Design a protein with these regions (language model features):
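Catalytic donor-sugar/metal-binding loop of nucleotide-sugar-dependent glycosyltransferases
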Residues: 32, 58, 67-86
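C-terminal catalytic/acceptor-binding lobe
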Residues: 65, 79, 84-108
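Membrane-proximal soluble regions of multi-pass membrane proteins
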Residues: 99-111, 195-239
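Membrane-embedded multi-pass helical conduit in multi-pass membrane proteins
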Residues: 133-222
Length: 240
């Protein structure tokens, strides 16, 4: 539901990333895994929200944090492919860098905050397996791949873990293709032609820098909550 997908290459690949994310979330849900909230367009039942303690003001990503607390309380989360909510992709690399650092920090912090509950019997075996795979792919793989690339550059040897990265990017390319080919009642999704797919796959490489950087920063520096609102133009300008 990205309204400014056609504005630039950067907004185009972000729109494709949103379709990729929705497809992956749907697959996780259908496979008995864990579904997550997204900040744009949540519909919450008040009793479920109150049962898990409401919103957490000590996190930079309240949607991801709330996802885990709803999960451990036994609440189910569903997915609506065509929500009546639209969003704007960020329009510059500095804004993207700031946004993705916040997403990475909040996404990683919740594992540290709720790991006892995530390992308990509150979750089904399939949900625990899903979370383990998700953590390894989204957080561990970028850190290992970055360290592997730095080591190989320093020693002038071939990276050891490059096959894993290639598999991850290939699967992402397939998910891009499937997600962007689905019908949309909202803003039109970018067409998954070969050039767009290659650019979108290359764009995913920024996570292999953001995740390691945020992981090191969280390990070295004290926890600090710095939430910076992403600037938006608004409907009138976005349509121009």
């Amino acid at each position: 539901a990205v309204v400014n997908a056609g504005q630039s290459l950067l907004t185009r690949v972000q729109a494709m990333e949103m379709a990729l994310d929705a497809l992956i979330q749907q697959g996780r849900l259908l496979g008995g895994g864990v579904m997550e909230l997204r900040g744009n367009g949540q519909l919450l039942r008040r009793p479920n929200l109150e049962a898990c303690g409401g919103f957490n003001e000590h996190t930079v990503t309240d949607d991801l944090d709330l996802s885990f607390r709803l999960l451990t309380e036994g609440s189910r989360i569903g997915l609506l492919w065509d929500p009546p909510v639209q969003e704007e992709a960020v329009e510059s690399v500095p804004a993207l860098w700031k946004q993705r650092q916040r997403w990475a920090e909040g996404g990683l912090q919740r594992f540290f905050d709720y790991w006892p509950q995530l390992l308990s019997n509150r979750l089904s075996p399939s949900q625990r397996r899903d979370l383990a795979c998700f953590f390894l792919l989204q957080y561990a793989l970028p850190v290992v791949s970055f360290a592997d690339a730095v080591t190989s550059a320093a020693t002038r040897t071939v990276p050891v873990y490059w096959p894993l990265s290639i598999v991850a990017f290939s699967v992402s390319g397939l998910a891009y293709w499937r997600g962007c080919r689905r019908p949309s009642e909202g803003p039109e999704l970018p067409q998954p032609d070969l050039l767009s797919l290659l650019m979108a796959i290359a764009y995913l490489g920024h996570w292999f820098v953001v995740i390691p950087w945020v992981s090191v920063r969280m390990a070295v520096f004290p926890k600090r909550l710095v939430w910076a609102k992403t600037s938006h133009r608004g409907e009138a300008t976005a349509d121009a």
